[in-house]
Swiss-Prot record:
Residues 1-20 are annotated as: Disordered. Interacts with REV. This is Protein LITTLE ZIPPER 2. Competitive inhibitor of the HD-ZIPIII transcription factors in shoot apical meristem (SAM) development. Acts by forming non-functional heterodimers. Part of a negative feedback loop. Essential for proper functioning of stem cells in the SAM.
Length: 105
């Protein structure tokens, strides 16, 4: 038995093959915890974005309803103005001009 070899009598405990099972469990646990945190963070971000989108959608819906009501009111005003315009035009240019009484005498 030769003790002057360059290899140590016991293998290096830092190599992956010689690490303890508790190290692997701890490392796996840290990885799982990290992934769980990432998943929760992503889920919170997605929920926040979803709420923001719903709020934006609601605001746009309310604004759209307001525009529709305003449009209907303007249509009614335009129709009334059109009728008034027709009435005034009829007064200005009657279909049958009255016969002048001076011509009949």
């Amino acid at each position: 038995m030769c003790l002057t070899t360059s290899e140590p009598p016991f293998p290096d405990t830092d190599t992956p093959t010689m690490r303890s099972a508790s190290y692997h469990i701890k490392h796996k646990s840290k990885t799982q915890t990290h992934l769980r945190i990432l998943n929760l963070t992503r889920r919170r971000r997605l929920l926040k974005e979803q709420k923001e989108m719903e709020m934006r959608n609601l605001k746009l819906f309310v604004e759209n309803q307001s525009i529709i009501r305003e449009n209907e009111a303007l249509k009614k005003k335009a129709l009334l103005l059109h009728h008034e315009n027709n009435a005034l035009f009829a007064l200005l240019h009657p279909k049958y001009s009255p016969v002048s009484t001076s011509l009949l005498q």
